[in-house]
Amino acid sequence: MKMRIISKEDFANFVEALIKDKTLNVIGVKAKGDKFAFGPLESASELRLDYDVTILPPKKYFFPQRETLVTYDLAKGFAAKSPIEAKPMVIIGVHPYDIVALLHMDEIFRETKSDPYYFEKRQASIIIGVNIQKMSKWCFAPAMGCAAIDYGYDLMLTDLGNRYAINIGSQKGEQLLDKYAKNVKPALARDIQLVGQKKREVMEMSQQKFDFPPELIPELLSKSYEKSGFWEKHAEKCLACGSCVLVCPTCYCFDVKDQADLSLEYGERIRTWDGCLLEDFAKIASGENFRPTRPTRYRHRYFKKGKYLFDRFGFISCVGCGRCSSNCLPDIANPVKLFNDMYHELRSIGEQVAPAAVPEVEIQTEGNIDYVPKLATIVKKVPMTAKETLFEIKLDDGTDLNHKPGQFVEVSVFGVGEAPISISSSPTKKGTFELCVRKVGSVTTRLHALSVGDKVGIRGPFGNGFDAEQLKGKDLLFIAGGLGIAPLRSLFNYVLDNRKDYGRVILLYGCKEPREMLFGDELRALAKRNDVEFKPTVDWCPENELWEGNIGVITTLIPQVNFDPETTYAIVCGPPIMYKFVIADLKSRKVPDDHIILSLERRMKCGVGKCGHCQINQIYVCKDGPVFNYSKIKGVPEAL
């Protein structure tokens, strides 16, 4: 690696030359009271390279706290806002741990579908790092291997008293130095040795010490998940304020909201930072909260950093900056203290912990995320119950949706927002597709108020659907509860349209009372077929309603059906509370784990595993699901 030497006076002139070039947006570390923050530089004298830690990490320039993804005009539809910054950025004074954090963010925003809003800014930037001179008392970057690095930057500065050593990490960095800096000299052997000494000194600066090798963190967490007392004790004082995730350089969760102007005819879709410690983070529109308590959210934060991302990407996503510790009002966010306590508690009960094997990871990418919805028209609207309506929708560009059974779309209503909705129609239905929508949140409530001919936006299809090919030749037992019939209908109708390819077909469907039954005409028509078995049930029947079917919860139907568990696949969808009871009954009938297929519901804001809302332990429902084989998730605590 090339190294150059420049005097501090010439380095200041280099910074001034960058600032004078109005084609560049020059960012640096500046004093802000008794703290430090990244901000635009107006002169080299503002630059502070002797800081301990900045309030926020430099990720804010690539993943801003507030960012417009899409604009809309009711007369024209949706349009993307260009993600490219008006000027290329030069960011001066980035500590090594924040550089490593950016590399982690790169992997996260690249996986599956890359985020163009993040990467356009990353690719148009130059990172000038600086080796740490002062270290925050909360910093433990040396323990995480992030205090001194030889990668990830364009230029890296080391303070050598009256001069800086500059490691050149990229061609962009070298070209920047050649163009704007003067009196740059090759480094001598003593300079190289001194830089090495400075980096070794950094490794001894930390006041925060682990009592064990940090490589044990993933396994420590694995052995501590079920220790509810440990998490309750450590989360007892948590305010659930989210300050720890707000300042974290590797937190990437976000929310998406629409913001209309006063005329309500124009607006924009905004992405804002979000945090898994906030109470409503995992709450869906119906009110179900899949992480309802502070201890479960507190635990999730640590598992996400130290276990889930390790399993998915091969790195512990904590760089040891210490910002979470320094910004926690009740002083409970120190990862070093928590992991030391965890280690000693496990040791006290005789648990042996060995380093986890680093998984072999190959990042799969499939192009860029398209946050811009396609315009579509409501061509038919059929009320089904007091709460559910069936919408038939046609894409305005004339294309088919080309979905798989079990997938979902993100539906946009201008000025209100976007919501994930399961596709109810079979892929064999061409020209249009159907969505059965329950009125529960702001988007679905507004959608119910729209009329035939009104416009909506559609993104998708998304997710992992049912494998209709794998099911060919098998007996199929569909078990649907309530609105769960909607996603199952896409596969059920596909099977009926290709009936000769499948074995026996049984549908068990339950709802609360007769008036809440969905697709009633279709279901009643099944009685005329001799190739489908259908059994309905209701939880209860009011005295003034006629009902000739079963009365009882959905599991009361399972004993009424004879089937061969070796040839039958059970396909299950319904409210969260239903799954464990249905699975227990299926297991009592000797149905193998891999013959049980489930469709799960979670909050989804992006559809491609970036926003973090749908995460259940290490799984992202929006891209790994929503359809799962039970054998793959039976050991995932948050799944069922």
Residue map of PLM features:
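Iron-sulfur-associated redox domains of electron-transfer enzymes in respiratory
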Residues: 1-221, 449, 506-516, 521, ...
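Local cysteine-cluster metal-coordination motifs and their immediate loop/turn environment
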Residues: 95-100, 236-255, 271-284, 315-331, ...
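A broadly conserved sequence feature marking short terminus-proximal activation segments
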Residues: 193-218, 246, 262, 268-294, ...
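Glycine-rich adenosyl-nucleotide cofactor-binding module
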Residues: 200-237, 460, 472, 479
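Ferredoxin-type iron-sulfur electron-transfer modules in oxidoreductases and energy-metabolism complexes
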Residues: 213-236, 254-354, 586-588, 630
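Ferredoxin-reductase
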Residues: 363-454, 511-513, 539-540
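FNR/FR-type flavoprotein reductase catalytic core
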Residues: 442-605
